């Protein structure tokens, strides 16, 4: 469906059926009583709240970018799910949990790609979750440590984008410079109401 959005403008019946099936699975995974989500909530209220924030902002960004809102929302919600296992490599643990709970490949890929430790983001939604997590986490850290004063939202977001782009973070995502600029603008203007 990423190819469809970027190139053809219309979905074939097969692509539409696949998209509908994916969204059906994602809707179930996003249910408040989904077993793995309950495990996350029981494990750590702080991690649960963080994940809910990343989920909400990622969904808004995906809507702004014309991406799959449910995929970005689920990706944000489960991006650090592996932490509930206590494993030192929470990404591998998260991928394993995703497979145990029969997550769609697209969602498992976001868990694997959200921090660049294993893979670079290969979709718009994975890039969104990565940037949302980085921006929200950095902003929270600066606020808690008393270092936020004097750091404008624009400076924070631009610095994170510049740092990530200099490391080739989006080189496999298929995003154009125009899309990258639009995503950066979302975080500055819409998310932070800058």
Residue ranges of each PLM-predicted region?
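Terminal helices and disordered tails flanking the catalytic cores of nucleotide-processing hydrolases
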Residues: 1, 34, 88-92, 115-194
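Acidic/His-rich, divalent-metal-binding segments that scaffold phosphate/diphosphate chemistry
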Residues: 1-92, 96, 188
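Hydrophobic alpha-helical scaffolding
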Residues: 44-47, 97, 101, 121, ...
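Hydrophobic faces of stable alpha-helices that mediate helix-helix packing
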Residues: 51, 104-105, 132
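Conserved, well-folded catalytic cores of nucleic-acid-processing
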Residues: 61-64, 84, 100-101, 114, ...
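Short, exposed beta-strand "edge-strand" segments with a Pro/Gly-rich flavor and a Y/T-containing core
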Residues: 62-67, 97-102, 169-178
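Alpha-helical scaffolds flanking conserved acidic
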Residues: 67-78, 106-110, 123-128
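Soluble catalytic domains of enzymes that build or remodel membrane lipids, polysaccharides, and related
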Residues: 82, 90-117
């Amino acid at each position: 469906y990423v190819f469809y959005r970027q190139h053809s403008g219309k979905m074939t019946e097969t692509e539409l059926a696949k998209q509908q099936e994916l969204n059906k699975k994602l809707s179930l995974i996003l249910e408040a009583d989904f077993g793995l989500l309950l495990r996350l909530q029981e494990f750590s209220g702080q991690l649960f709240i963080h994940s809910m924030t990343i989920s909400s902002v990622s969904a808004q960004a995906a809507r702004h970018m014309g991406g799959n809102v449910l995929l970005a929302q689920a990706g944000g919600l489960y991006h650090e799910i592996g932490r509930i296992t206590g494993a030192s490599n929470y990404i591998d643990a998260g991928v394993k949990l995703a497979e145990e709970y029969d997550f769609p490949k697209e969602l498992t890929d976001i868990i694997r790609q959200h921090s660049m430790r294993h893979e670079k983001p290969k979709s718009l939604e994975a890039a969104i979750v990565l940037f949302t997590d980085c921006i929200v986490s950095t902003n929270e850290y600066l606020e808690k440590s008393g270092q936020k004063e004097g750091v404008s939202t624009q400076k924070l977001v631009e610095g994170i984008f510049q740092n990530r782009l200099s490391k080739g973070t989006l080189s496999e995502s298929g995003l154009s410079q125009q899309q990258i600029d639009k995503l950066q603008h979302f975080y500055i203007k819409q998310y932070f109401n800058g």
